């Protein structure tokens, strides 16, 4: 997945107003009655109306081979809403839809196509509002107040199938095998696709497709489905239906990165910042009982306590994991923040990252070579940079139009207050000192002398994440930093975007008439006392980067107003999300991993102990998606990320990489 931007669909609308693919010379849906055909072929062919009331789990998972206009998804969503209205007490509470699309429609074409079905407008409008950018990989959309989740995988389905994480195995309750007709698009209808459908299908899972082509039926049978023909819709004579009648087994290609969830639903989250708050909401949405323990007297006293934090993605020319994770995380964060029913100071004013010297300009050129969509990242020359930011820097750079700033302290407090209305229990001044495994879960020991037990524990407590025995060996480190709060001036008030250089400067917050400028960097330090040297350096870095900018010299730090925080980071600039690995057992079990990969077993982890940390300086960007990934993993649901990137987020990755090369772990 080295190609990050995706080509949008090349289509036209025929005389009936139906979208037609120019590339495949085929309609996206029937000219006659596409809506009724979807209901008959996919909902009827999978017997969903009969299965929903009897479904034994709270989540029903549907996967689809071609999203197209989203007609199948919208029709299913409508039917699911009607089912929930009629059966509010049913076990089934949520719908999860996974779909693949090589050439996604533009937002404008999508809206035009949806004009065909005014009865679907209430659902279509929600889809339009969250329609993602044409970026490769998985885009998770949380819809209908969390009752419906849509995972849109952009890219060639036969390439993506090899990149899906094994946690998707046997998760799909029903398959919609859709797409342009086999004669029009033979590249999609492959044995590889049929085998992937079988791998992902739950025992008892079903499939339906509009075609009755013999090679499709035989291919699905070979993959493991029991197939039968059914009368086709309208003038079509036949269609195919199938069922996965037995459980297939598949060896893990990378058992050292296998993720495990939990069958339990009582969890203690340790922390009080943005990651803890977002994870609390994600787990509550899935029916967990959540209790939060925070060492401080109130939330957001650590790295999440700043007045203004910048929101923009981290990019790297040479690191595929960073370039897949952070754009996905950034776009997910914007969708989530925009949909939150809480208020917090923010401004999506854009972020401009400037090349102030030859080295930084080269770095920006490398980022621009990724050819991301302009709506995500676009080059600006010095004049354009001045036009975007409102101030003259005489530097070129890269602008993130959808970026901006927000107040993490306000957001965190608002999220935890929202979670409390949904059942979150909060305990402050609880400093975790030890964890011990019990027969039914974990005992948590606090510095204040209190001990409690919970079935599951998540460590999301920032730089304190490695302060218990189980996590002490983790290769993470603390970084102390000071952010200066400066009063605005007429010249500084002209700044319209967040400015990033060898530091950062935010536009003024209208509520405080102050800017934030930062931040100092002290690796290995957890010191939070005010430092005058840091205050001076924050100002001087701005002046050094833009020596000809008179406005930069107006920065006034004489009030000694600042905030000092500590963040947790890793050497590879990626978060750690997943099971807490057992260090000693990992080294013992994988001592000969470089020579015995084929015989490797699953990596040893502490059961029902998870972590979400090492968010570094991009926590506002990465925390929403990390929380969603971990909540999905813990709940044994589909995870919105490809296998390679999930491996790059695994807390054991730095050890395993060395062991795979036969190197010692120190």
Curated annotation (Swiss-Prot):
GO biological-process terms attached to the record: methylation; tRNA wobble uridine modification
Family from the record: In the N-terminal section; belongs to the methyltransferase superfamily. tRNA (mnm(5)s(2)U34)-methyltransferase family.
Alphabetical keyword list: Cytoplasm, FAD, Flavoprotein, Methyltransferase, Multifunctional enzyme, Oxidoreductase, S-adenosyl-L-methionine, Transferase, tRNA processing
HAMAP family, per database record: MnmC (MF_01102)
Role played: Catalyzes the last two steps in the biosynthesis of 5-methylaminomethyl-2-thiouridine (mnm(5)s(2)U) at the wobble position (U34) in tRNA. Catalyzes the FAD-dependent demodification of cmnm(5)s(2)U34 to nm(5)s(2)U34, followed by the transfer of a methyl group from S-adenosyl-L-methionine to nm(5)s(2)U34, to form mnm(5)s(2)U34.
Enzyme Commission designation: 2.1.1.61, 1.5.-.-
UniProt source species: Citrobacter koseri (strain ATCC BAA-895 / CDC 4225-83 / SGSC4696)
Coiled-coil spans in chain: none
Cell location: Cytoplasm
Region (tRNA (mnm(5)s(2)U34)-methyltransferase) location: 1-245
Catalysis: reaction(s): 5-aminomethyl-2-thiouridine(34) in tRNA + S-adenosyl-L-methionine = 5-methylaminomethyl-2-thiouridine(34) in tRNA + S-adenosyl-L-homocysteine + H(+)
Protein name according to UniProt: tRNA 5-methylaminomethyl-2-thiouridine biosynthesis bifunctional protein MnmC
InterPro entries: FAD-dep_OxRdtase, FAD/NAD-bd_sf, MnmC-like_methylTransf, SAM-dependent_MTases_sf, tRNA_MAMT_biosynth_bifunc_MnmC, tRNA_MNMC2, tRNA_S-uridine_synth_MnmC_C
Cofactor names: FAD
SUPFAM superfamilies in the cross-refs: FAD/NAD(P)-binding domain (SSF51905)
Cellular component terms per the entry's GO annotation: cytoplasm
A GO MF term: flavin adenine dinucleotide binding
Region (FAD-dependent cmnm(5)s(2)U34 oxidoreductase): 270-666
């Amino acid at each position: 997945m080295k190609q990050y931007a995706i080509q949008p669909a090349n289509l036209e609308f025929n005389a009936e107003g139906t979208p037609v693919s120019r590339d495949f010379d085929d309609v996206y849906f029937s000219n006659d009655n596409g809506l009724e055909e979807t209901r008959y072929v996919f909902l009827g062919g999978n017997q969903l109306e009969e299965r929903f009331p009897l479904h034994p789990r709270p989540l029903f998972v549907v996967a689809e081979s071609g999203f197209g206009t989203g007609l199948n998804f919208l029709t299913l969503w409508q039917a699911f809403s009607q089912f929930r209205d009629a059966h509010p007490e049913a076990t089934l509470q949520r719908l999860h839809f996974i779909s693949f699309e090589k050439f996604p429609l533009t937002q404008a074409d999508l809206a035009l196509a949806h004009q065909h079905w005014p009865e679907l407008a209430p659902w279509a409008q929600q889809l339009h509002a969250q329609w993602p950018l044409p970026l490769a990989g998985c885009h998770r959309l949380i819809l209908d107040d969390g009752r419906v989740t849509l995972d849109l995988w952009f890219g060639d389905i036969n390439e993506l199938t090899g990149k899906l994480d094994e946690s998707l195995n046997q998760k799909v309750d029903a398959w919609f095998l859709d797409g342009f007709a086999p004669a029009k698009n033979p590249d999609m209808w492959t044995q590889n696709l049929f085998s992937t459908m079988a791998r992902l299908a739950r025992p008892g899972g079903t499939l339906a497709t509009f075609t009755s082509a013999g090679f499709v039926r035989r291919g699905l049978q070979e993959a493991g489905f029991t197939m039968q023909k059914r009368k086709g819709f309208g003038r079509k004579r036949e269609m195919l239906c199938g069922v996965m009648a037995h459980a297939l087994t598949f060896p893990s290609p990378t058992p050292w990165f296998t993720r495990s969830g939990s069958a339990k639903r009582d969890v203690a989250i340790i922390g009080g910042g943005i990651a803890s708050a977002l994870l609390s909401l994600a787990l509550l949405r899935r029916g967990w009982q959540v209790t939060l323990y925070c060492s401080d007297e109130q939330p957001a006293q650590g790295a999440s306590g700043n007045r203004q934090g910048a929101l923009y993605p981290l990019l790297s020319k040479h690191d595929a994991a960073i370039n897949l994770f952070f754009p996905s995380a950034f776009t997910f964060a914007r969708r989530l923040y925009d949909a939150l029913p809480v208020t917090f100071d923010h401004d999506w004013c854009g972020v401009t990252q400037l090349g102030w010297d030859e080295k930084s300009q080269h770095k920006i050129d490398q980022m621009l070579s990724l050819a991301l969509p302009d709506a995500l990242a676009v080059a600006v020359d010095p004049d354009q940079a001045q036009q975007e930011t409102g101030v003259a820097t005489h530097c070129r750079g890269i602008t993130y139009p959808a970026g901006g700033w927000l107040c993490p302290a306000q957001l965190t407090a608002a999220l935890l207050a929202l979670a409390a209305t949904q059942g979150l229990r909060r305990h402050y001044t609880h400093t975790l000192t030890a964890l011990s495994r019990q027969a039914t879960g974990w005992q948590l020991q606090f510095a204040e002398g209190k001990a409690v037990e919970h079935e599951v524990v998540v460590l999301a407590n920032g730089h304190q994440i490695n302060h218990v025995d189980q996590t002490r060996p983790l290769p993470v480190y603390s970084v102390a930093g000071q952010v200066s709060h400066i009063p605005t001036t007429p010249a500084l008030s002209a700044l319209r975007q967040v400015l990033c250089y060898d530091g950062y400067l935010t536009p003024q917050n209208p509520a405080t008439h102050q800017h934030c400028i930062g931040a100092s960097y002290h690796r290995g330090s957890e010191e939070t006392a005010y430092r005058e040297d840091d205050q001076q350096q924050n100002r001087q870095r701005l002046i050094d980067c833009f020596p000809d900018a008179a406005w930069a010299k107006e920065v006034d730090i004489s009030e000694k107003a600042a905030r000092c925080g500590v963040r947790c980071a890793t050497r590879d600039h990626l978060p750690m999300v997943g099971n807490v690995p057992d260090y000693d057992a990992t080294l013992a079990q994988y001592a000969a991993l470089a020579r015995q990969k084929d015989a490797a077993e699953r990596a040893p982890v502490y059961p029902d102990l998870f972590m979400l940390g090492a968010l570094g300086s991009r926590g506002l960007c990465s925390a929403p998606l990390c929380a969603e990934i971990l909540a999905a993993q813990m709940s044994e649901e589909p995870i919105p990320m490809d296998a390679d990137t999930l491996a790059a987020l695994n807390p054991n990755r730095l050890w395993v990489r060395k062991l795979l090369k036969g190197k010692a772990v120190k």
